[in-house]
């Protein structure tokens, strides 16, 4: 299957993994595989979004995600505008609804949004006439990160069905964890979460995951070890005694990784805190997929933008 022959994506927006069917997910991954091949060519551009306008509206700092969406849009031929919230009317007291109305009046075709409040992207999508992509909303969802993680796993393992995936660390504050739990289980993986009790959401068992507070026990038999960033900017209390203590019990080093399956692969959504969530020799080692995740991010975002383009007028 190529991007041109992929089945039509039945959704006007991409607001989360929740609500996507397994065929929806697999169709996006097939498109992303084609985008990987394109991105590895000398000539990397397509024209599917030529004449279209994409606005990247980020209310939270981002390097990887924003630059990845920008590159994805440009490779598909879009005119891409990055809106700096730090110097925008938002800083002067403008509400999200007013911002949405202002942007809508500019008649963009696609708006990519990251916001610190869960549900904010869904609200904005109801107020505009264009396609909206969720680039992360609070601790709720980060759908393109989960898609790129699935693509990375699939390309290295040949599939996801039956794999044992451990998601480790600050699960409480992680939109990446939530989206990955939903997506990986939809594709047949068995998911377990590992972290201190202070960083695990109450009632997370209802998502069908195994829960471990002992990392060494939790890593046994795992095919994939997915580390999460310790999100200290979202913590207004004492969730961990110290970063040194955190690394001792929940940071991934060689001794802990050895408890997983031989050849288990390591992932991290970035940015990494070396020596806090993961040791440098593991992050840079032969079992690490972290750099590949970055490459897959551009491909997945190209796939998402291209899929949504089918719903644009004359798209």
From Swiss-Prot:
It catalyses: carbamoyl phosphate + L-aspartate = N-carbamoyl-L-aspartate + phosphate + H(+). Its EC number is 2.1.3.2. This is Aspartate carbamoyltransferase catalytic subunit. It comes from Methylorubrum extorquens (strain PA1). Pfam families: OTCace (PF00185), OTCace_N (PF02729). The keyword Disulfide bond does not apply. One of its GO terms (cellular component) is cytosol. InterPro entries: Asp/Orn_carbamoyltranf_P-bd (IPR006132), Asp/Orn_carbamoylTrfase (IPR006130), Asp/Orn_carbamoylTrfase_sf (IPR036901), Asp_carbamoyltransf (IPR002082), Asp_carbamoyltransf_Asp/Orn-bd (IPR006131). Pathway: Pyrimidine metabolism; UMP biosynthesis via de novo pathway; (S)-dihydroorotate from bicarbonate: step 2/3. L-aspartate binds at residues 92, 175, 229. Heterododecamer (2C3:3R2) of six catalytic PyrB chains organized as two trimers (C3), and six regulatory PyrI chains organized as three dimers (R2).
